[in-house]
Structures are given as structure tokens and as C-alpha cells.
């Protein structure tokens, strides 16, 4: 029982951390504070008492700080060797660093939180990395009537400052160390998205450093206002993905439809607490039929309870199935128990999950947990769950949007991959996460995020530490994904059942004809019909293709 309890605890943490697959630093908070003025777009707009005196700092090979900055990357499969890492403290310093790199003919990219799953930053061709980690201020900007978040902030900082200062939050991810830069520009999905949409749906403006046709960098402020001549740049950064158009040094957040100037009313309210129900099955309890029934139950519930405005959007759930030998199957659901009816919702959800599943799970329900503490400190990092030191963590993640659940044939395939004794490494998994609700109330063209009728997000991941295992570890997750989506060319093409993949789960295999044999290119899988507009914006805003990576938007 001690081992079962330990496993249930670590797997429950992974249920939350899976969204990041993705320590609170000094931030600025307080009540309705005096806002930082917003000067001309080209001026330095950073908070002086956080950034004055810092930067720019250039760290090159041979500097003792250089290895630390390279290790900010999440995935040890990739390690860059740039000529310099430029630590910056202001927008003007970013402009300067970009200008220097472009003038020298050096490929430049940006790092925020460091959680990119592919080698978009840690690419051997990248010669200059602009590191935004010292630009992390969070404050209310009365001039913009919105909350400003600098591009180097991480989610835990944002949640803490918004909650302690104004009692509001954003519907972002549950891995606290994820950076806002990639997260928001890729859409920004999290536990509260069924209630409040994606973070990109709550994005009012961005400040972006772009490079013109003459190779000159400058900063531009782009808002969602219909009469803003730079609105296209806002739209592209509301889900178009990071590393495509420029470097975002600041985001301004305000919920659509919010009115007035009271900052406590301009973003979603912080939940009153969190109550979590956890159901755990060991693999010894689940044969193929029971596993198929359980996962089908999860999909059916989401098909029936994910429409915009549905009461059940108060509940968010995950199902994590980890390979035999390391864990089992855990279903985790959470609500705000201070909302009337939600505790009964948890009970009803648990009954729906266990229907016709012969084996009874180990079940537990927490009391009312503090929202901020639980959100920022209790989500387990993947490395800790699997016992892999973070310095050695190597991974591969593949994803899919689902409008409907899986077929029995697909689930038999998943079961075989998760339980077959022919594969002995135990840290592979499938994860399913609640989607829909408020997200699906927006048009596919409101922002650059086109996926507006799915009810679940699925992920298939593998984690390991030894570089010598690379080939077989990649083969396992690649073949699992290919076989699950075998009837559609090995990928989740947009159709009546699946709807492509989440931009923040980049997968270069989608651009490889060896693994994507469908007629849908990677750009359709990620962007659907919005890709053509993104290409137009790319051509206009980054005509020299300064900002690019393996899956970046291509100019016309």
C-alpha cells in the first residue's frame, strides 16, 4: 500500500505537469498601482527599478556562466553552442542585440522559459541567443488599461502577482516554470481554459521587436483594436507560435468584453480553491477490455460535457496512462469547490469514469486546497516523477486535438504499446486532457488558433536519460503515434474526429514524410486555414526570415 500511495501521488502530480510538457522570483505587485507610462514604440519601456543597471550582458564560450545559460533548455536531446548568449533587461537592449546579430550575419533566436520541446533554440546553426529571463515584471498598466507581463516571466510569477495584487488570473498552463513568451504566442492552454478560453483569447496587445527589409530592428506595439494598423501583428502572436515574426518583450492582458478601469474586473477571478478527485488503477487490475472501457468513458464524458456555457466546464480532468512497470492509469479531476454544485460534479464524474470497469480504483478526494499554493508549487516536474535528474532529461512529445474519443481499435493499440513486455523502458505514456468549453466559443479566425471544436487534447510522450537509448526511445513513441492514427496517414489530420496538433507541442516528425504519410502538411496540422494569413504577415513583418526554425511559418 505504501508503494501504491507513492505512485498515486507522483502520477497525480504528472496529471497537472503534463500541460507544461512542457521558484518564484521577484515580481512587482500591489493594489491598483500607478502604471508605467507607455512611451513611443521605439523607446525603452521596461520598469526602471527592475532593469536599470542590468544588461546588456554578453556571455560567450569560456565564461563560467555559459554552461548555466545553455542548461536553461528543457530537453537534453538538444544543446546549442552559440557564439554568445545576450542577457537583456529592456526592449531597447533587445533591439540593440538583434541589430548587432543581423549586421554580423549571425542567426539569432530568443529564449524565455526554456521549455521548448524541439531544438528551436538549441540549434547548432543559432549563433546568438537573446535571453529574456531578467525581463520578468508583472504589473497593471493604466495607460493600456491592461495587465503588462514582460516576455521573460514564468507562469508561477504571473499567477502569484496577479492573484496577490488584484485577485485575478489567466487561464494558462499548470507547469509553473513555463515561460510566458512561447506559452502565450502558442495559444496558452490550461486548467481554466474551459471556463475562460486560452490565454491568447485574453491577449490585448504585444510589444514585438521586428526586423524590416533593410535589416533594421525596431519595436512595435500591436493591439487587438480594430483600427490599429499593427493589428495583424497582434493576431499572429495570439496563437501563431513563438519564433516566427519577432521577439515579444511585453504582453498586455485583458479579457475580451471586459469594461471599466477597475483592474480586479479585467481578467478572470482567481478560483476560491481547488478540490481534486483522484482515481488510480494498477496495470494488474486492467486487461485490454477494462482499459478500453475506461478510456472510452473519459472520451464520452468530454463529448457530452464540453459545449460553450455548459455547467460541466467547471470541471477539468486528465487521464494519464504510464507504461507498465512504472505506474498505471490515473484519472484526476478538479473543480473550484466554492462554486455551487461542483463537489457533486466530482462525484458524478467519478461514477461516469468507473462505469462498466470491473476493477475498483484506489480513490481519494482532497479538501479545499489553496489555489495559489497548489497551482504554483504542487505540480510535479516530469523529471521528478520518473526519477530522471533534470540535467539528463531527454524527451519526445507528440500531440493531437480530438473532437471525439478513440475507437476500440485505437485503444487496443495503445494498450499493446503500454503493456507489451518486449519493450522494457517504463517512462512512456499517453495523456488526455479536458478541452473545449469557452475555447470553442470563439471563431477559428478570431485569433491565430483555429482549433475551436475539440473536446480533448491528447499527448504521447517518452522520457529517458541515456543518449545511447535515443534510437529505441524515439522509435517507441513514433511508432505508437503512427499506429494510433494509422487510418489517417499516421497523424491526427483535421477531420470529424481529430483536428491537428497544439502549436506549443512542436513535433518535427509532422514535417517528415516518413512519419506523416497523409495529404495534410505540418502547416495544416498546426494552423489549418489560418496558415495563409500567417504567411502574409510573415512576409510583411519578417521579410528577411530572420526568425525561423524547423516548423516556423514560411513567407509567401
Predicted regions and their residues:
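N-terminal secretory signal peptides and thylakoid transit peptides that target proteins
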Residues: 1-17
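C-terminal region of N-terminal signal peptides and the immediate post-cleavage residues
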Residues: 21-41
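Cofactor-binding catalytic cores of oxidoreductases
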Residues: 39, 43-74, 113, 118-121, ...
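Glycine-rich N-terminal segment of FAD-binding domains in flavoprotein oxidoreductases
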Residues: 63, 74-135
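Glycine-/small-residue-rich beta-strand-loop submotif within the FAD-binding core of flavoenzymes
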Residues: 76, 92, 122-150, 191, ...
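Structural signature of FAD isoalloxazine-binding scaffolds in flavoprotein oxidoreductases
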Residues: 87, 118-136, 194-212, 247-250, ...
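Short, structural beta-strand-to-alpha-helix junction motif
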Residues: 145-149, 153-163, 177-180, 370
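FAD-binding subdomain of flavoenzyme oxidoreductases
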Residues: 172, 177-281
